[in-house]
Swiss-Prot record:
The keyword Ribonucleoprotein applies. This is Large ribosomal subunit protein eL15. GO terms for cellular component: cytosolic large ribosomal subunit. Residues 162-196 are annotated as: Disordered. InterPro entries: Rbsml_eL15_core_dom_sf, Ribosomal_eL15, Ribosomal_eL15_arc, Ribosomal_eL15_CS, Ribosomal_uL23/eL15/eS24_sf. It comes from Haloquadratum walsbyi (strain DSM 16790 / HBSQ001). Belongs to the eukaryotic ribosomal protein eL15 family.
């Protein structure tokens, strides 16, 4: 049976460090390091993943690549007024994933657009790159698109900040079901002091 073009792309991205994709990624990262933290791009790097998440090559749909530095939370030592237990600086993790941070930064950069979803495209020793799919809710092409016009409704404002994107829902634990997920819905803080 003949395989689709997208299946070949997906297969290559399962191991981006091997084969022809590895050399291509090596060249890309050299260019990406010289660019800014948030860059608008013409077309997605991973076409299969972008299409899977709702991307369409049409007006009103924008892709931005965002670089976020790796590692735990950067925290400064307090100058006064903490007991030793609360003075922690090192070994503190983030409460949000790097992917979610990337979505929020893109949403702040483009306040008139709405975040649809995002996906990983690469990383090196010091940073990770994600591509964010952004939608213009005022564009006529989006308002007339039956697959995307739901995002034009005002209830979808600030999706990235409210944890409603794919990275946000994953970060909130909403992909887990059954035992151990009793306190994740509707949110980790609702009804109990226990979180995820």
């Amino acid at each position: 049976m003949a395989r689709s073009f997208y299946s070949h792309i997906k297969e290559a991205w399962k191991q981006p460090g091997d084969g022809k994709l590895a050399e291509l990624q090596w060249q890309r990262k050299q260019e990406w390091r010289d660019q800014g933290a948030i860059v608008r791009i013409d077309r997605p790097t991973r076409l299969d993943k972008a299409r899977e998440l709702g991307y369409k090559a049409k007006q009103g749909v924008i892709i931005a690549r965002v670089a976020v530095r790796k590692g735990g939370a950067r925290k400064k030592r307090f100058t006064s007024g903490r007991r030793s237990k609360r003075q922690g600086v090192n070994r503190l993790g983030r409460r949000t994933s790097i992917q979610r941070i990337a979505e929020e930064r893109a949403a702040r950069k483009y306040p008139n657009l709405r975040t649809l979803a995002s996906y990983w495209v690469g990383e090196d020793g010091s940073q990770k790159w994600h591509e964010i799919i952004l939608i213009d809710p005022e564009h006529a092409a989006i308002e007339n698109d039956d697959d995307l016009n739901w995002i034009c409704d005002d209830t979808h404002k600030g999706r990235a900040f409210r944890g409603l994107t794919n990275a946000g829902r994953s970060n909130r634990g909403l992909q887990n079901r059954g035992k151990g997920a009793e306190h994740t819905r509707p949110s980790a803080g609702s009804g109990s002091r226990r979180g995820k």
